């Protein structure tokens, strides 16, 4: 299990302001175990000892996992090919979600990395409804109304890159819309 890269990605999310304060959460799957950020954690200050462990049924092995545990579990239970999940409250994506504006994939990188974006109506944070709505999406990049984004991948780096490209696309949409 590569917790060093997991921690590095958490720090990048914080350093690049994709999360602020104790917002956002990250997980990776290793067999029947999920390594996930703890509730109330500041991703920029996270270390290996802080990471929680649960099994695929939600039984807690170590720590107190994020309140979005149900969402992570449902995604892993519904998608065998997913081994990493990144959930952020990145500013531009969240702003577009609040306005119900769809993002255009302006760059070739976005078309390759993001491909298509799913949009999920608002559900309360940590709710089973949110978990079910997100896990039913076939897309790997999901924008949550008034909440943020979820990206998934075969590994933590892939999920992170989707987060980065999705937020860049939101910024480009903002700039292009304001230059028209």
Swiss-Prot record:
Catalysed reaction(s) here are: L-fuculose 1-phosphate = (S)-lactaldehyde + dihydroxyacetone phosphate
Which is a GO BP term held by this UniProt record?
A: pentose catabolic process
Identify which cofactors the protein needs according to its UniProt entry: Zn(2+)
Q: Where does Zn(2+) bind?
A: 68, 87, 89, 147
Q: In which pathway does it act?
A: Cofactor biosynthesis; coenzyme F420 biosynthesis
Question: Which family is it part of?
Answer: Belongs to the aldolase class II family. AraD/FucA subfamily.
Q: What is this protein called?
A: L-fuculose phosphate aldolase
Q: Which organism is it from?
A: Methanococcus maripaludis (strain C7 / ATCC BAA-1331)
Q: What is the lineage of its organism?
A: Archaea, Methanobacteriati, Methanobacteriota, Methanomada group, Methanococci
Supply the gene name.
Answer: fucA
